[in-house]
């Protein structure tokens, strides 16, 4: 285990802070400038549209009656804590994993603040084609998804290198 924060993945925590503030500032801008369901068309396939998400990704459990707010709060705190512990235990040189963990932490904490302050998450990024809309999302959601992809990518690369080295031993 690295001895100082400079030697550990915690050195990358600034990414989580940056994601958190970008997410919160963008949501505050939406709350100050949009009415619920109001849209601003930016491109023929892209709007800013203020919606409230009472659930998780893709509005999962959004109509569950309110208990999901506390479930998702516990999940966000739990994952953020776990990833912070893992950051502390790994080397600062593990670029992909440190970036992935801090993206997820920043996104989870950004959405956590919304849940605690408002009881819902502010979503506003709206991609569409004709009349078909992708579920609205926010900067925190984007960071969580990018972080998850990086974690999966790293797992596949780690598995491949272990397989390659195991095959090398067999020869």
UniProtKB/Swiss-Prot annotation:
Enzyme class: hydrolase
EC number, UniProt record: 3.4.23.36
Pathway note: Protein modification; lipoprotein biosynthesis (signal peptide cleavage)
Pfam families membership: Peptidase_A8 (PF01252)
Residues at the catalytic site: 123, 141
Protein name per Swiss-Prot or TrEMBL: Lipoprotein signal peptidase
Membrane topology: Multi-pass membrane protein
Function text: This protein specifically catalyzes the removal of signal peptides from prolipoproteins.
HAMAP family: LspA (MF_00161)
InterPro entries: Peptidase_A8
Reactions performed catalytically: Release of signal peptides from bacterial membrane prolipoproteins. Hydrolyzes -Xaa-Yaa-Zaa-|-(S,diacylglyceryl)Cys-, in which Xaa is hydrophobic (preferably Leu), and Yaa (Ala or Ser) and Zaa (Gly or Ala) have small, neutral side chains
GO CC list: plasma membrane
Domain of life of the native organism: Bacteria
GO terms under biological process: proteolysis
GO MF entries: aspartic-type endopeptidase activity
Family from the record: Belongs to the peptidase A8 family.
Compartments, record wording: Cell inner membrane
């Amino acid at each position: 285990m690295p001895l100082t924060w400079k030697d550990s993945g915690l050195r990358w925590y600034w990414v989580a802070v940056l994601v958190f503030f970008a997410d919160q500032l963008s949501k505050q801008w939406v709350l100050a400038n949009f009415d619920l369901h109001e849209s601003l068309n930016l491109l023929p396939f892209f709007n800013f549209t203020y919606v409230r998400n009472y659930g998780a990704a893709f509005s999962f459990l959004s109509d569950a009656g309110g208990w999901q707010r506390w479930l998702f709060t516990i999940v966000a705190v739990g994952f953020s804590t776990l990833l912070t512990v893992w950051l502390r235990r790994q080397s600062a040189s593990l670029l992909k994993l440190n970036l992935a963990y801090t993206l997820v932490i920043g996104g989870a904490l950004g959405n956590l603040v919304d849940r605690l302050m408002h009881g819902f998450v502010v979503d506003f990024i709206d991609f569409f084609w004709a009349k078909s809309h992708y579920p609205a999302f926010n900067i925190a959601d984007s960071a969580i998804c990018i972080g998850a992809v990086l974690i999966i990518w790293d797992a596949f690369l780690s598995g491949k290198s272990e397989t390659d080295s195991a095959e090398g031993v067999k020869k």
